[in-house]
């Protein structure tokens, strides 16, 4: 007996469609040889009816209807009562979903700025008690009685003028040689006269006379005939 088994394609190539009828082989359209599970088989074309898969729609959930809030608790009415304004921005859609995000800005007029007081956070400062002498009582001179403190009166301050210090003189490194020589002469002239005791006899220093310098002729020197 000849084997007449038919291998059908169980893979779903179109996920958006679902089968209605089973696969019916059509032998008259030819066949092709393919490899299925390491076995060489002849694949014949089949016919099957498919329909579009219905979309899963969201179930309609009844939305509860809440009673309107009183004006005292209604935020929109509270903003309107305060003279404010509600600004609604453009709706933004969340990518990949059908949801949207609405942003609402509430603008309220600010007339009075609130500054918290430091005194509200700490108790009031109490000044320390002071001993005040009674009025009309005279004490012994040896007893010193402190007078009540009075406001200190400071004299008006005068504006001090800044005196410029004289410019420093140039150092010897920046002075010329003529200035240094002139200064040395001045120092030599201002030396005080020395007076000795009469018992001390000081003779003036005697320097030997300088011998006249004779002209020295260089050895092996030839002069011009005009020089005698």
Curated annotation (Swiss-Prot):
Keywords, comma-separated and alphabetical: DNA-binding, Host nucleus, Late protein, Viral capsid assembly, Viral release from host cell, Virion
Coiled coil regions, renumbered to chain: none
Function comment: Associates loosely with the viral DNA to form an outer shell around the nucleoprotein-DNA complex and links it with the capsid by binding the endosome lysis protein. Dissociates from the viral genome during entry. Might be involved in nuclear capsid assembly of the viral particles through its association with NPM1/nucleophosmin.
Underlying gene: L2
Protein name: Core-capsid bridging protein
Subunit structure: Monomer. Homodimer. Exists in equilibrium between monomers and dimers in solution. Interacts with the histone-like nucleoprotein; this interactions bridge the virus core to the capsid. Interacts with core protein X; this interactions bridge the virus core to the capsid. Interacts with the endosome lysis protein VI; this interactions bridge the virus core to the capsid. Interacts with the peripentonal hexons. Interacts with host NPM1; this interaction might play a role in virus assembly.
Biased composition (Low complexity): 168-177
Induction summary: Expressed in the late phase of the viral replicative cycle.
Annotated source species: Murine adenovirus A serotype 1
GO biological process: viral release from host cell
Note: All late proteins expressed from the major late promoter are produced by alternative splicing and alternative polyadenylation of the same gene giving rise to non-overlapping ORFs. A leader sequence is present in the N-terminus of all these mRNAs and is recognized by the viral shutoff protein to provide expression although conventional translation via ribosome scanning from the cap has been shut off in the host cell.
């Amino acid at each position: 007996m000849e084997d007449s088994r038919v291998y059908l394609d169980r893979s779903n190539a179109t996920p958006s469609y679902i089968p209605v009828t089973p696969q019916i082989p059509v032998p008259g359209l030819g066949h092709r040889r393919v490899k299925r599970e390491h076995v060489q088989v002849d694949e014949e074309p089949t016919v099957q009816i498919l329909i579009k898969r219905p979309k899963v729609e969201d179930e309609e959930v009844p939305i509860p209807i809440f009673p309107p809030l009183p004006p005292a608790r209604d935020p929109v009415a509270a903003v309107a009562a305060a003279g404010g304004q509600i600004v609604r921005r453009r709706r933004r859609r969340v990518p990949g979903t059908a949801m949207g995000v609405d942003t609402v800005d509430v603008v309220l007029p600010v007339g009075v700025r609130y500054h918290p007081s430091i005194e509200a956070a700490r108790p009031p400062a109490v000044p320390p008690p002071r001993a005040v002498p009674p009025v009309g009582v005279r004490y012994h001179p040896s007893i010193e009685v402190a007078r009540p403190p009075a406001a200190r009166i400071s004299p008006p301050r005068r504006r001090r003028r800044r005196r410029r210090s004289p410019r420093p003189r140039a150092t010897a490194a920046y002075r010329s040689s003529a200035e240094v020589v002139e200064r040395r002469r001045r120092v030599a002239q201002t030396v005080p006269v020395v007076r000795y005791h009469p018992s001390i006899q000081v003779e003036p220093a005697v320097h030997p006379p300088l011998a006249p310098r004779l002209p020295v002729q260089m050895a092996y020197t030839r002069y011009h005939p005009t020089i005698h």
